[in-house]
């Protein structure tokens, strides 16, 4: 495992990317939105210590029930993954990443809705929301004009917003295992 970590460090160095991977590999989990704990309950990572130049932040497979985006001062963040946690709602502070975020992965949580602020992420190209409890998507979703990939599989969606037809760059829409009766018309 140490060799793999070294390889990731070398890859990040070679490509100029800075990745902070806070996914537990030892059974650890997050107990609150501010730090992650190791398997013994000790603090393993304090999010305020995350390098401000980080472009990728991976917080998958923890037990986060909430996540306050204002605690992160990451203006260069391109990829944020919070998959496989216990998030029930998304903090509207997500809009603070509007100038940089291109990939947002939130699958396998307990999200019931998304704040309208999600639609302010104008550079977003990939949005994964599968395996949640979403009953609807924001009406303004069509404002994500750069969106290429949208996954909303395994939710409770009865309809997709009509503005979805405005996503002219959308290459992949995956909406399997929902309660859909019709698709919005293309515009």
Model-derived features: where do they sit?
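The feature captures the LRR N-terminal capping module
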Residues: 1-131, 135-139, 148-153, 159-162, ...
